[in-house]
């Protein structure tokens, strides 16, 4: 499930929530450019929904200060 999408000219940053095979909450951060296949992702494992929302707030603040916009 996509939680937030950010974009900046030719770049994007997406945040997904997903449970892994062990039932743990996982926040998946994916980034890259619109015009190529280059990019990456990382997994942040959260103990509960509250921790996941705290991570979302932290990442959103960073993205917005770097001139990304929500879409």
Go through each PLM region and give its residues.
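Extended, non-core accessory segments
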Residues: 8-9, 54
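Negatively charged, low-complexity tracts enriched in Asp/Glu with abundant Ser/Thr
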Residues: 1-8, 37-38, 49
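Alpha-helical structural elements
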Residues: 1, 7-8, 26-29, 63
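Boundary/linker segments flanking structured domains
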Residues: 65-71
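Double-stranded DNA-binding cores of transcription factors and transposases
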Residues: 12
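Short aromatic-glycine-(Arg/Gly/Cys) micro-motifs in beta-strand/loop hairpins
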Residues: 16-42
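A short, charged, amphipathic alpha-helix used as a generic interaction element across diverse proteins
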Residues: 37-40, 46-64
């Amino acid at each position: 499930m996509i939680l937030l999408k950010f974009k900046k000219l030719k770049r994007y940053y997406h945040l997904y929530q997903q449970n892994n095979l062990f039932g743990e909450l996982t926040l998946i951060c994916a980034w890259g450019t619109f015009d190529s296949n280059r990019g990456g992702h990382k997994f942040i494992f959260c103990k509960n929904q509250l921790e996941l929302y705290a991570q979302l707030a932290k990442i959103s603040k960073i993205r917005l200060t770097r001139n990304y916009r929500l879409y």
